[in-house]
Amino acid sequence: WYSSMFAANIKQEPISHHNHHHHHHHGHHQHQQRHNSNSNASSPHQSPLPNLQLEQYLKQQQQQPLMPPGLPNPMQTIMPANMRPSPTARTTTTTAAAAPTTTAAAIAMQANDKLQALTPPMDVTPPKSPAKTQQSCAEPEKEHDLMSNSSEDMKYMA
């Protein structure tokens, strides 16, 4: 019974880890696509503004279906080929596609913020803590070694 439960835990753990890794990679990839589309649309580089502009633009597109066809191109670059809005179901497809892109970009940006927030302490603390421990451990050892060496040298010298 214990071995079977342990094997089940072993089986379950890599699966969950793989799913988490795949989800994070997908969110990051979506964020890269969104960044490229924003640069094509020549929108500001700050992260909150493109989301708001994209939502406002989609609302405008729903209210005014007679806009030029060149404007939805940045949106089409984000969506897969099967999700591209056809002229008949443009409003429903854009509203359905607006939520996943914004949420995926928000998740990716949150993940990037978490990574950026976590990496500097992780990069800074390991050099500090081993240096502190090495210094605190090495200084008494140095003094002790100097004392023992000097006393031994004195013994051997005498």
From Swiss-Prot:
Its main location: nucleus. Residues 18-34 have a biased composition (Basic residues). GO terms for molecular function: DNA binding; zinc ion binding. The keyword Cell inner membrane does not apply. GO terms for cellular component: nucleus. It is found in: Nucleus. Residues 139-158 have a biased composition (Basic and acidic residues). Residues 18-96, 118-158 are annotated as: Disordered. Residues 41-50 have a biased composition (Polar residues). Residues 52-65 have a biased composition (Low complexity). One of its GO terms (biological process) is segmentation. Keywords: Developmental protein, DNA-binding, Gap protein, Metal-binding, Nucleus, Repeat, Zinc, Zinc-finger. Belongs to the hunchback C2H2-type zinc-finger protein family. Gap class segmentation protein that controls development of head structures. This is Protein hunchback. It comes from Drosophila mimica (Fruit fly).
